Amino acid sequence: MCLTGVDYFSTLGYQPGIAFLAAGALAPIATVILVLLTLFGALPVYSKVAAASPDGQGSISMLEDLLPRWRGKALVLVLLGFAATDFIITITLSAADATEHIIHNPFVPHMFDHPVGVTIVLLAALGAVFIKGFKEAIGIAVVIVAIYLALNVFLIGHGLLEIFRHPEYVPRWTNALYTQHGNPVMMLALALLVFPKLALGLSGFETGVAVMPLVAGDRVRNTRKMLRSAALIMSVALIGSSVVTTLLIPPAAFAEGGEASGRALAYLAHHYHGELFGTIYDISTIAILWFAGASAMAGLLNLVPRYLPRYGMAPEWTRATRPLVTLFTAITFLITVIFKANVAAQGGAYATGVLVLMTSAAVAVTLALWRASSRSWIPFGVITLIFGYTTVTNVIERPDGVKIAAWFIVTIVVTSLISRVLRSTELRVLGVTADPLAQSFLQEVAHSPIRIIANRPDSGLFDEYAHKLREAQETHHLPPNTRVLFVEVRPSDASAFSEVLNVAGADIGGHHVLRCASPAIPNAIAALLLFIRDETKQIPHAYFGWTEGNPIVYLLKFLAFGEGDTAPVTREVLRQAEHDPELRPRIHIG
């Protein structure tokens, strides 16, 4: 909960100020609407997501299952772009906001007045913590969140007590409401219009699901408990902070350059409790803002290795933690330099990433319930519409968020496709298994030259194999009565990258056939030839016919659909998989 909370709870550092700038005196009412959306929208949705995806892949995994083949993977790449926007900007924005608290503290020397440099130091320190390991990150998160929440409970509680002691604050606030907005209906309508600007207060749910693999015991039940606890704590804190800051802080102090700008609760800490407590609160806020990136980093480290390497769209080293942490830290450096560590410039992209992921989660849950013929899809459909409205409103008002997300999406898609092309001639097989009949075929030919004829599956009747055998004997000058094995690979989901090759034997009128299915036919044949070599301790010879057609067209067909000019690609896969030519299965084309 604390690893999720450093992201979720840290928004208290700037959320009250954003709420007042967006809604003015309506800020507490708009915050109540946000809390209702949290408790009755986001929380039910992510409780369903946690049950459907206990490995931490979240709503993205659910949508991947709902859409087959390349369509599902294309959607995943787009959503990964928004997830990257959310998580990376969480890291950079929080560190930049921590920097703002540092350089504007009266006790900090002016030599630190370099936002980009200070932010990069904070990001490097965060990366170093994760390179050391998850356990250390969780331990630090627990300490930071416990102290920060304790200080906020005291600060908000004292603020409410101050309002109780001075009841004139309440009529002053209600008079401002009626003066500006006339009647309660108009107040509610305006609050519904402005509450999407407060969407940063929803930031912890996707991260909460993403870190599920770190939850011990009954993972789904405990994750739901974690999300529920975090949501309830944050709901109370959001409403309390909005009330005390709106009623106790002069409106002019919220303006840009004002004493409460970007640090409303810190303003109250200094104003009511003196510089010592105020500085302690500043240090706690700086710590949680800096470490807010920890939960985002955990989410990235969980998402990326589960998708891109499996799609063949990233090198295998991206499954390891330390290289990924180094890569993500370098990206955060770049983003910080591009945006000059400006918090406001990154805010739109942050909210856009959060809302798109939440909307996709609501869509995934609604579709899953609808497919299961459960009538509960109707309330989740309503939640989806509300999240959709919130997202569209945010995009219209802050289009820069979509632009930044588009940059992430294009970068992920382009680099993923390049990686897929570069890795297309890898073996792409996780293992080979053969049924008893296939094993018996291999045992029969183990003590004689092993000749394999590649056959494109057709009718599966005796005449097909008799014709193919005669053709191979004429083309390759095979001796009469030569014992051969036929190999057939049926194309499966071409969008998949690697899987276990399950080989089944078939006896068609005395012709022995080895059959399997694979997303990439040449790679499967290469893997099967290496398997035959290892099982029989002999070098197999495989016989192919030349393919009629343009080789460039067949190359593109292989990249997209896993089949094309089979023989030369099979030979290239074997060349990369087995570096010793003497041990490499032989390929014959005629």
Language model segments and positions:
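Extracellular/periplasmic helix-exit of transmembrane alpha-helices
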Residues: 157-170, 224-265
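Membrane-interface "cap" regions at the ends of multi-pass membrane proteins
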Residues: 1-14, 63-65, 69-77, 185-191
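Helix-loop-helix junctions that connect adjacent transmembrane segments
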Residues: 146, 153-203, 396, 400
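Extracellular loop-to-transmembrane helix junctions
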Residues: 19-65, 71-76, 92-122, 147, ...
